[in-house]
């Protein structure tokens, strides 16, 4: 007799404990590995964000712009220098050409006559005397201007006015320079504000995009989790159904074993009754035995009918056919049971010879009915066994498909988790980079403000120091001139003017 197949969850307690310990250790190792990965990830994120913030900071941008402006100024100076050099080369070339022409003229004029040279000498002498006379008149005029008190007062007032105008021009230039610095500072602030607004808008768009992606991912994850739960429920249901089918198969095998045992008992009883030759009692016992067999077959068929009613997922046509076959077999057995009871009631009225004849006749009928009943029961049990085997195969296929779907969903969930982790990592890196950039910009602005204040204070100190030094020099010069008194000025001999 084939033993029933045990389900997969009937293991010993020691093996269950070993599996639990192994799973616990694997989970601890997985958690440690995940913690190490997370720690390494945050370290790398900090390094990347710091470098990215340093490279994308306002200070780095300002350095790049300053270097660009300096390079541009150098190029402009270089172009200006080249232009001036070119102009100087042109002037030198023109002078060389003029000198060459003069030398050529001199070579040509050497052969002129002496009279022309004397005439030229007289003309030069008269021109020199005229210039000397004019220079003497100019010197006398300058001496008269210096010796005239009114003219000196006018010159002093003009000098004071010139000094005041020069101071005003310096103040105006300083104010203009300060206005230019303020305008440059305002321009930089406007550029910084514009860049900050653009960064805020970009951050806002990125945040909205990430929110949409997260919402879409959350919907997908929720759908996958629900599908995974359904697959788990389906797997549990299929497993339970397989256990029920195995149990039914085992029960059918037990029923067949009981019928075989009853058949053996019947044969032994027939042998003993045949030897006793007590026909009436033997027929009664035989009738009771047949009734017991019929009752047993009736119970088996009732159990099969109840099992068929429980199997709701079978195909309707096959299920109705199986129920109809079992019900018909049950009806036949009930009719035979009723007939045997009537036969048992007729035994009391029979004599010995009649009982012997009836016994032979009944024995033939019983044998024929038993063979027919056994054949029908075998067909019913074989059909039931085939149905259970088909359902077990379908259940195994469904379980395999459920396992594949569950593995696929788990892979998708793992991919979604990794994608979410990468998105969070990028978001943290961007936040850190923006925060570092803002801090660097604030520090740069504060440093520029301090440098501007220090530079302004130094310029004011230098300006005040130069003013004090000039006042001291003027006071010393005035004291020296007062101590010396008036001194007559001497003039050197004027240079001879040659054309």
Curated annotation (Swiss-Prot):
Keywords: Coiled coil, Cytoplasm, Cytoskeleton. Disulfide bonds: none annotated. The keyword Lyase does not apply. Its main location: cytoplasm. GO terms for biological process: apoptotic process. Residues 260-426 are annotated as: Trichohyalin/plectin homology domain. It comes from the Eukaryota. Residues 17-143, 169-304, 405-485 form a coiled coil. The keyword Transport does not apply. One of its GO terms (cellular component) is keratin filament. It is found in: Cytoplasm, Cytoskeleton; Cytoplasm, Cytoskeleton, Microtubule organizing center, Centrosome. Pfam families: TPH. InterPro entries: CFAP53/TCHP (IPR043596), TPH_dom (IPR043597). May act as a 'capping' or 'branching' protein for keratin filaments in the cell periphery. May regulate K8/K18 filament and desmosome organization mainly at the apical or peripheral regions of simple epithelial cells. Belongs to the TCHP family. PANTHER family: TRICHOPLEIN KERATIN FILAMENT-BINDING PROTEIN (PTHR31183:SF2), TRICHOPLEIN KERATIN FILAMENT-BINDING PROTEIN FAMILY MEMBER (PTHR31183). This is Trichoplein keratin filament-binding protein. The gene is tchp.
